[in-house]
Amino acid sequence: MSRQHGETTTMKTLYIFLTRSGTLLSNLVYRLTGAQYTHISLAFDEDLSTLYSSTRKNGYTMFPAGPSREYLNRGVFLMRENIPCALYALEVTDEAYTRAKRRTQHMMHHGELYRFNSLGLLLCWMHIRWHRRRHYFCSQFVSEVLQKSGALELPKPSTLMHPSDYAELPELRCLYRGTLAGLPQRQSMELGEVESVMGLYLNVLLGAVTVSYTHLTLP
């Protein structure tokens, strides 16, 4: 808790998780920019049981992508345990925490309305500001949640924020820096099984065919 003008303010903690996942897109960004971290996620609990970002929806393949939940013991995080990562804490008011969580949950519940901002990501690394409604890349997603909830004042527009920028913000406190395998929260988790990427693509294809057929047969 903190005191302001004689009043007690209840504080809560948001968690910012930075990684360089080693995927094709991550490696491309790393080679072009040299950025230590190429992906960012947001968590509301210290155990990091659920992370939120705009990323691959099935945890493995690049597409489909958009606002999604991530898990440290599944998907890419399961396959690449030696990737570099960093965990930061951000102290916010109870009201800002609630607004951030409500906004994030709304986007998760209405995921069909949102898309991954591929062009915006490219322009971001070129330092060109470009906004497209309901389209987000990872750092844009986290930045808008934090900014619009009043949790954090950004040094630049959300469409220009890079994951590595968060490692330089004075408001954030570093809790861990190292490999994913050494992260205490992940060490306490039961690891899942690695799924076949081919099987995932087939499921995505079958899902798309089913949706298309449903739309065609509806009266």
Locations of regions flagged by a protein language model:
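Active-site nucleophile-His-acid catalytic modules used for acyl/amide transfer and hydrolysis
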Residues: 25-32, 79-159
